[in-house]
């Protein structure tokens, strides 16, 4: 009986480890990648175009490394699906609703290959680091979530990490709302710039929230996606202190939304 109990405990531990490894890329997409902010200097490759009036060299803080991370996560997801299907012999699940998404991914790749400016299709362009790999990655992420998030336990584990990421983002946003922007502090600048750390000039006025999302308008999209989830959790969670926490996060994001002056989110 004792042996059976120990074996049962070991099996549960192994299942938990496998569960964490499976939801890890989803956690990265929901909670980690949105926070990535770091300086990246690059050549625009646009100087040959008559319509471009900017400098040949530019700097990015909010998009490039998010792009790299998302591509890595997408590759991880593909490998994880292959392992689960062939290594663990899980049943491959498919739904006809994904056919349009698969067609979109294929057309996107063909379009990138056929483009006269394929360099930008595969590497991204000035202030728009969204190459074809990212567009195809969105399709991979959508299917992976459909394949993995199929039971209540997995969803609960994922939401916990998602809430952690939202909490960090809300804390950063509140610092911007109350004109104590963490990214403008000495420590914040050291975290987002390579040595030697330089003093940065921000395009957004002090008191306007932008989180780590490049454009204050993106704050509107972020808030309108997250707030309904938090409100739903307020009404479905049993523990009182959880409800209070979710309500506080929802209220914080609404405040951050108005501070961002994002018409997209308010509308």
Where are these regions (language model features)?
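Membrane-interfacial, low-structure loops and terminal tails that flank and connect transmembrane helices
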Residues: 1-16, 88-94
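Juxtamembrane membrane-water interface segments that cap and precede transmembrane helices
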Residues: 45-63, 118-121, 197-212
């Amino acid at each position: 009986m004792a042996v059976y109990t120990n074996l049962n405990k070991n099996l549960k531990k192994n299942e938990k480890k496998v569960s964490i490894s499976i939801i890890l890329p989803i956690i990265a997409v929901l909670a980690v990648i949105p926070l990535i902010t770091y300086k990246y200097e690059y050549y625009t490759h646009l100087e040959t175009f008559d319509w471009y009036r900017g400098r040949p060299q530019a700097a990015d803080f909010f998009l490039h490394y998010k792009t790299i991370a998302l591509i890595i996560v997408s590759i991880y997801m593909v490998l994880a699906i292959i392992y689960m299907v062939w290594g663990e012999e899980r049943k491959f699940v498919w739904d006809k609703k994904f056919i349009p998404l698969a067609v979109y991914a294929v057309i996107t790749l063909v379009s990138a290959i056929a483009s006269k400016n394929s360099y930008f299709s595969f590497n991204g362009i000035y202030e728009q680091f969204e190459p074809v790999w990212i567009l195809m990655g969105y399709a991979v992420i959508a299917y992976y979530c459909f394949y993995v998030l199929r039971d209540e336990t997995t969803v609960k584990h994922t939401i916990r990490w998602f809430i952690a990421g939202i909490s960090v983002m809300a804390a950063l946003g509140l610092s911007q709302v109350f004109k104590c922007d963490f990214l403008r502090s000495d420590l914040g600048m050291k975290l987002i710039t390579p040595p030697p750390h330089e003093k940065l000039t921000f395009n957004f006025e002090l008191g306007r929230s932008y989180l780590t999302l490049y454009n204050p308008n993106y704050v509107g999209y972020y808030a309108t996606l997250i707030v309904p989830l938090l409100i739903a959790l307020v009404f479905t969670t049993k523990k009182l202190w959880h409800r209070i926490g979710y309500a506080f996060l929802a209220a914080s994001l609404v405040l951050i939304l108005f501070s961002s002056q994002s018409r997209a989110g308010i509308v």
